[in-house]
């Protein structure tokens, strides 16, 4: 591998790490995390498949009877979801690309179906805004 190629890889890794450091937990908890609990017509809630999952998008299981996560559980979810944000190329972020319809730029890696039919879906936009660094107001 050439030196410029190695440098490009190091820069991309550093940018992703910096983005993960700059993502806002309060915004995540108030605006993004509720999306994972939301029932979408024709789909299971994200938490149903991703609680305790063995993949990168692993959400904490909800306690019996709970309708939300505790702050500690939310922080663990935040850490897992933050790793799915690619700040160097936001639209290639797995958290945005996997559940998006192929016709809107998504991919085939989400076995839970196309949760978002377009980038205009309000929930997709909420996740994208958070990934860009928007903060809760």
Predicted segments, located by residue:
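A ubiquitous, low-specificity "background" feature that marks scattered single residues
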Residues: 9-12, 129
């Amino acid at each position: 591998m050439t030196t410029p190629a190695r440098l490009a890889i190091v820069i991309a890794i550093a940018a992703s790490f910096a983005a993960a450091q700059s993502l806002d937990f309060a915004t995540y908890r108030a605006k993004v995390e509720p999306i994972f609990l939301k029932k979408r017509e024709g789909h299971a809630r994200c938490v149903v498949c991703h609680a305790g999952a063995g993949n990168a998008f692993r959400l904490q299981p909800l306690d019996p009877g709970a309708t939300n996560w505790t702050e500690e559980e939310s922080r663990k979810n935040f850490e897992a979801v933050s790793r799915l944000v690619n700040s160097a190329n936001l639209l290639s972020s797995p958290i945005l690309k996997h559940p998006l319809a192929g016709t809107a730029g998504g991919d085939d890696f989400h076995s839970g179906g196309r949760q978002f039919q377009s980038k205009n879906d309000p929930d997709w936009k909420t996740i994208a805004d958070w990934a860009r660094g928007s903060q809760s107001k």
